[in-house]
């Protein structure tokens, strides 16, 4: 469990994982920096909120929660000594995005897997579309 229910603070175990993972992740991406438009830290929640909460309210409460969690991750990784030389690139290319419950994980029966839906992931967005346009325009 990365976060306590309804909370945005990183737990100690997740901090250890991020401290190990993120500097290596940046190193792996480094040779491809010119092809990367953005790296997104994506926050997701289950669709559940407190009993009696409307679906609309639950969606927006979960939006705030998912955004807060991604911000917590970004703040933590930004402060890591191991990525200090990359801070300028991080400032320009890493975004924290909350998706609320809009991208749930489904089980084998097509039902929401509430535990697996609560997650933070990293997604690389390339600038391939820009490169393709440049190639086509140069012909």
Regions flagged by a language model, labelled:
Residues 1, 11-36:
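Extracytoplasmic beta-rich ectodomain segments of secreted or membrane-anchored proteins
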Residues 4, 12-15, 44-138:
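Periplasmic OmpA-like peptidoglycan-binding domain that tethers envelope proteins to the cell wall
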Residues 34-40, 90:
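Short beta-strand elements
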């Amino acid at each position: 469990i990365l976060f306590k229910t309804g909370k945005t603070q990183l737990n100690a175990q997740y901090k250890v994982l991020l401290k190990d993972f993120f500097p290596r992740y940046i190193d792996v991406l480094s040779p491809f920096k010119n092809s990367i438009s953005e790296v997104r830290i994506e926050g997701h929640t289950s669709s559940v909120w407190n009993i009696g909460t409307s679906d609309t309210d639950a969606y927006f409460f979960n939006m705030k929660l998912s955004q807060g969690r991604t911000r917590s991750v970004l703040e933590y990784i930004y402060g890591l000594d191991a990525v200090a030389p990359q801070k300028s690139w991080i400032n320009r290319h890493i975004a924290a995005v909350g998706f609320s419950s809009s991208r749930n994980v489904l089980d084998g029966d097509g039902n929401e897997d509430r535990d697996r839906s609560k997650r933070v992931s990293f997604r690389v967005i390339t600038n391939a579309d820009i490169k393709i346009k440049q190639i086509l325009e140069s012909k």
